[in-house]
Structure formats: structure tokens, C-alpha cells
Amino acid sequence: MSGWRETYRGIVYRWEVDHNDHLTVAFYFARLGDAARGLLDALGLGPDQARRRGRLCLTTDCYVRYLRELRVGDIMHIASGVLAVEPDGLVLVHKVFNTETGEVCTTVEQRVHHVDARRRVSRALTPAQRRVAEGQRVDWDGPARERRPRPAGLEGFRDSARDTVKPDEVDVFGQVALTHYVHRFSAANGHATAAFGITPGYMRTERRGFSTFEFQLEVGGVLRPGDPVCVRSALVHVGSSSMRLLHVMTNERTAERIATLEQLGVHLDMDARRPSPLPDAIRERAKAILVV
């Protein structure tokens, strides 16, 4: 299997870097959007199919491992391929490379669902579409996914982000782009970690940050311009330097659950660029608000 295809090549711009001094996760998803569209277009499942046949490939699940940082000015490229061909969808895989060093910085497993563009119901891939996709199959050596227990409900979750979907968030498929989901989850993370003491003031004074190393993103609903959105978050695990948070995004008008994000990260020493143990006071505050 040799179906790897370059689907993105670019650079990290200064305005894409967050307060942790590296490429913010939402802009990884902007690149992922480019990569997925490039691969789907090569498979005959891109925007042209949406216009001609009324069919879309919608992302329903992403498993992302952030392995190495990308910082201001770093040059990067993405290679993409097909891991699995399913009756009504595909599992795409992507590797994000630091072009200068050749190192893999991020791995992504992305499940897309083939649906009717208007009614959002499943549509089987045609035999021809399946054959083309099989031709892009690749061997995959990305990190294995771990499924962890999650809270059954939202008791103990805190409001962590709230806004309204804007018209300019819509992508070439007519859907709200994933990067905008992740921008909201990033804002939610700031409020969720501040609840146990990792505040902006603390991070500036102590030269500490929050560095994400894993996402498990699930998208089950649809957002449209004008929809009111709320994210609620909970801390579900705390270690010596690591934390795991669960974020739940809902449409406030309909109460529909739109997406969930399981986010794993570490307390980052901004100068050493290494994980740093949580101070005892912060760890105790974190344990006091754990939701299990």
C-alpha cells in the first residue's frame, strides 16, 4: 500500500501562535481541513461531488496526537491517506511534518461519513468510489487510541464558552469548519483550568502553560450560522503534571449535543518546554472539583 499523498504545505504564522508560544490547536484543524479536502477531492468526494450529486463527507470523529511542537516560522507539510473503507464512509489518516527536521509532529485519524447533503442521512459509497479509495490505502503506525471512562451526565460541569455561530465560519462544503469548533474548545479550556488555579495571571507570573498532547473529538450534530452555542467542561483526571478534561458543546436553542472533546495536556514549563509538576495547592484544588 503506497497511497500517501501530500495534501498541505505551508508555514506557521505569528498570529496563529497562542499564549503557550506554539501553533494553537485550532489552526492545526485549519490545516487538517485543507488536507482532508485535498484527499477527498483526489478520491472524487470533494466539493465538486457536493455540488453535482448532493453528497458530502462529514467528519464524525478525530483522534489526534500532538507529538512535537510547531512554533513561529516553522515550515510544515501534511501527508494523507486512507486507513479504512467502510460502506458509508472512510477513515482518513494524516501525518503533520516539520519540513525542516523531517520529524512527525502530529498524527490524525479522521472518520468521515458519506451523507445526503440536504437530509444528512447515510449514503453508501458506490463501487467505483470504493475502488478509488482502496487505491489510496496506506500502512499506519500512529499511536494506538485509548478509550477511557467518561461521566454519564453533565453534573459538575461548568459553563466554559458561549457565543453565536458566524456566517464566515462556513467552509466550502457549506458546513461550519472544524477549526471553529476547536477555537471554542480552546476558550473553554482556559475557563476550565482557571477554576482550579491555572489562571492567565498564574501562567504569566510563573512562566507556565497548558500544552495539549491528545484530542478525541466526536461530532454528532450540525451547527449553522446564528445558532447559539455553549460549551460545558469538567476536569476528569489529574496526575503529577497531566490533566484530562471533557468538553461538551450544545446548541442552546435546541439543547442538541453537537460535539464532545476529550482533551489531554500537561502543565508546561514555558522556558524548558517540558512538563512541570503541578504545585500542591493547584493539584488539591483540582482534585476537589474532579468529575468522575
Walk through the language-model features, giving the residues of each:
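Gly/Ser-enriched beta-turn/beta-hairpin loop segments
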Residues: 50-52, 203-204
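Small beta-barrel nucleic-acid-binding modules, principally OB-folds
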Residues: 54-72, 207-222
